[in-house]
Amino acid sequence: GVQKTETQAISPVPAEKLFKGSFLDMDTVVPKAFPEGIKSVQVLEGNGGVGTIKNVTLGDATPFNTMKTRIDAIDEHAFTYTYTIIGGDILLDIIESIENHFKIVPTDGGSTITQTTIYNTIGDAVIPEENIKDATDKSIQLFKAVEAYLLAN
């Protein structure tokens, strides 16, 4: 089955800086900005571009330990970034993959980020709504932590 969510957040950080910090430099920025969510990121394959596979060690703010991700698309001009979670205990043994699509749009004095998440479950498995809501809340927490880090640095 497929379950889909979309969330949006407004930021005072300019689109280019937000894109760079959130995605291009995420391996170093995110663990510094939100260590309780993401402890470390290790590149398993690739050079940081499309096709790169990473192992992410999660922090104490989540009930999970790891996730394996694959970068699917990066557009530095359109400020879009897509990655898929393809492994780890975060998939709960009922999810085949989780696609995360991000788009940052410049606004007067900042930017707007939209995240579309597509959960591809195994067979007819259904992810409980509270799990999806919790994942969405964690994404917003992560975004706000990165935003605060970028504003301070």
Swiss-Prot record:
Superkingdom: Eukaryota
Keyword Cytoplasm: yes
UniProt subcellular location: Cytoplasm
GO terms for cellular component: cytoplasm; nucleus
Keywords associated with the record: Cytoplasm, Endonuclease, Hydrolase, Nuclease, Pathogenesis-related protein, Plant defense
Gene3D superfamilies with a match to the protein in the record: 3.30.530.20
Class in the EC hierarchy, top level: hydrolase
EC number: 3.1.-.-
Pfam families given in the database record: Bet_v_1 (PF00407)
A biological-process GO annotation: abscisic acid-activated signaling pathway
Keyword Cell wall biogenesis/degradation: no
Gene Ontology terms, MF aspect: abscisic acid binding; endonuclease activity; protein phosphatase inhibitor activity; signaling receptor activity
Chain's role: Catalyzes the two-stage endonucleolytic cleavage to 3'-phosphomononucleotides and 3'-phosphooligonucleotides with 2',3'-cyclic phosphate intermediates.
Family: Belongs to the BetVI family.
Record's protein name: Ribonuclease 2
Species this protein is from: Panax ginseng (Korean ginseng)
